[in-house]
Amino acid sequence: MILLHVRKEGENMKKIILASGSPRRKELLELAGVPFEIVVSEVEETIGAYSSPSDIVMSLALQKASAVAENNSDHIVLGADTIVTYESRILGKPSNEAEAKEMLQLLSGKTHEVYTGVAIIAKDKTVTFYERTEVTFWELTEEEIDAYIASKEPLDKAGSYGIQGKGSIFVQHIQGDYYSVVGLPISRLVRELKQFNIDVTHA
């Protein structure tokens, strides 16, 4: 069993709060043995004039975490955001099936990038970081795309696919962190949490 270690003696154990309702991020934290609670951020995400996808995901992750941290200042709050990009075009969650089909046709046979940004907020410290992963799709037939859209899986996913689900059959090659594409670069996160005197790597 993996336990939470807080190294400052005499300090009350701080809760880790995930500022996201994503079932995939929840599953990854559970997989790593990170104890946490969920408080879904209700913040309206706004994308300003940022210079890069990495800036966008880190800013959105920080917006989510900050909104929850306002009422949980004694604890550690995690926020995360994921976007898919292809040739400088940002592919978020599709608004409908037609948009999902357009995105999948665009990604067919091509290499795109997935950025996930993470923000960790505590009373005396804030850390933000991101991971970039390249994903290459096989050439997709219209029948494959239509069948996938009919499953409804792509409708709540950035880029209109879930690499951990049925969308996995579209992936020819991946370079980078698979878990970041799922929604949370869990290995990097565990290491960054050590800056907050939290270590989940010891049994």
Swiss-Prot record:
CDD domains: Maf
Keywords from the UniProt entry: Cytoplasm, Hydrolase, Nucleotide metabolism
Protein name per the record: dTTP/UTP pyrophosphatase
GO-annotated cellular components: cytoplasm
HAMAP family in UniProt: Maf (MF_00528)
Gene source species: Bacillus cereus (strain ATCC 10987 / NRS 248)
Disulfides per UniProt: none
Cofactor(s) of this protein: a divalent metal cation
Ranges that cross the membrane: none
Site-annotated residues for Important for substrate specificity: 24, 82, 164
Biological process annotations from GO: nucleotide metabolic process
